[in-house]
Structures are given as structure tokens and as C-alpha cells.
Regions:
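Conserved beta-strand hairpin/beta-sheet module of binuclear metal-dependent hydrolase folds
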Residues: 19-67, 160-177
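Short, Lys/Arg-enriched N-terminal segments with co-localized hydrophobic residues
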Residues: 6-21
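Active-site HxH/HxHxD metal-binding segment of metal-dependent hydrolases
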Residues: 55-140, 165, 172-173, 231-235
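Hydrophobic residues in well-ordered beta-strands that form the structural core
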Residues: 50, 98-100, 177, 218
Length: 238
């Protein structure tokens, strides 16, 4: 936890406005270490969870207790099993409202399909979505405006959640991108509804158009920045 808290402190100092009061807890969990992001605001007493890998409730419950925050929403970047495996338990335990993109409705509500794709039964349960989101949607969470950008290619319903920065305050924004983009890589496109050509259009049109200093929080692996990936990502050069 010491390393994580140090990282969070660095991130918080760079965030603008309402984001300055927010802590980002990076929690790799589940069978393939999928990143969940717990956003907590102790002043408001509220928290938001981005993605829900397996057994994530056991990870976030003590943090919610320590920060005196109630989990109010769960946002799914997409409907693949490793990002929603713990979603049903999270909703049962917290009554959090769920947001996701309708293009992944069949994956989220009919997890048997993912069982067929991956070839094993991981005890997946359907997750009830309260609000279907789409490209360009904006809403408020923890006192901050959030923008939805649709980034299909890894799968049809992959979205990112963007918190804008503030140039005047030299504060970077943050984008939680699911499996569209990783540090030095991109999401796989060989699963049903995947398309590398579509993924490339999504990344160039929806992620690379964000400010270069935007912090990118991916579904797997370490964080990066938009500028770093534009300069060095070997899958999207030229």
C-alpha cells in the first residue's frame, strides 16, 4: 500500500478542480490481473468503481470503510468477463448504479456467451445496467464532469471515461480507457466483434485527440500518457 499511496499523491497534485479531492486506488484483481479503479472522495463520502474484476469487492470494501465512502456507481468500460466478473457481487453489496455501453449489452446481461468464448465456466453472473451510455454523453460524478468516448475495436462496447484537465493550473486530465490502449500496446482484436482497423480509428480519433499530458489508465498494466503513446506505441505509428 505504501507504493500505491505514493502514486496516488502524485496523481492528485496534478488534477484540477474537483479532481483534487479525489483519490484513485489502482487495484489489479481477478485471474488475469485486470485493473479496477476505485475513485474516492472522502469530503463527499462517495466513491465510484471503474470495472469489476473477480473478487474486487473484497479489495474495495476495506478502502470504503477506511475512507468513509459509499460506493454509488459502477462504470464498465466494456463487457468482457475479466472486467465484469465481480460486478454482480459489487451491486449486491453496495446497491451501486451501473453504467455501460449498449453495444455490449448481450455480454453484460448474458455472460454465458463469454463462457463459450473463453471455453471455461468462471461463475459469471449477469450485471443489471441502470444507465446505457453513448458517445459524447456527459454527466457529473463526485462533483466533476465526466465525458464518455466510444472506442470500439477491442469489442463493440468499449468506452473511455474522461476527466478534463486545466491548462491554466497546469493540471492533467485523466482517461480510463479499458482495453482500447495500453502502455506500449493495444487491446487484442481477435475476439468476436474485434477489429484492428476499427480500434486504430478509435484510438486515433478518440484518445490521441486528447491533450498529450492526459493520464491514461488502462485495463491492464501501468498507466501512461497520451503523448507517450503517440510518440512510442509501436502498433499505431505512421
Amino acid at each position: 500500500m505504501t507504493r500505491l499511496r505514493c502514486f496516488l499523491g502524485v496523481a492528485r497534485r496534478r488534477f484540477p478542480g474537483g479532481l483534487a479531492a479525489m483519490k484513485i486506488h489502482v487495484l489489479p484483481a481477478g485471474p488475469i490481473q485486470t485493473n479496477a479503479y476505485l475513485l474516492t472522495d472522502s469530503a463527499r463520502g462517495e466513491a465510484v468503481l471503474i470495472d469489476a474484476p473477480g473478487d474486487i469487492w473484497a479489495e474495495i470494501e476495506p478502502i470504503l470503510t477506511e475512507t468513509k465512502c459509499k460506493l454509488v456507481e459502477l462504470w464498465l468500460t466494456h463487457g468482457h468477463w475479466d472486467h465484469m466478473q465481480g460486478g454482480a457481487e459489487v451491486v449486491r453489496e453496495s446497491s451501486a448504479k451501473v453504467r455501460a455501453h449498449k453495444d455490449d449489452q448481450i455480454l453484460i446481461e448474458t455472460p454465458e456467451i463469454m463462457i463459450e468464448i473463453i471455453g471455461r465456466d468462471l461463475g459469471l453472473e449477469p450485471v443489471k445496467v441502470d444507465t446505457w451510455i453513448a458517445q459524447g454523453d456527459k454527466f457529473e460524478a463526485l462533483g466533476v464532469e465526466v465525458e464518455v468516448r466510444h472506442v470500439p475495436g477491442h469489442c463493440m462496447g468499449n468506452v473511455l471515461f474522461y476527466f478534463a484537465g486545466n491548462k491554466d493550473k497546469k493540471a492533467a486530465g485523466a482517461a480510463f480507457v479499458g482495453d482500447a490502449l495500453f502502455a506500449g500496446s493495444v487491446g487484442r482484436t481477435d475476439l468476436p466483434s474485434g477489429s484492428f482497423e476499427q480500434l486504430e480509428r478509435s484510438v486515433r480519433g478518440q484518445i490521441y485527440t486528447l491533450p498529450d499530458d492526459t493520464l491514461v489508465f488502462p485495463g491492464h498494466g501501468p498507466r501512461t500518457t497520451v503523448g507517450t503513446e503517440k510518440r512510442t506505441n509501436p502498433y499505431l505509428q505512421g
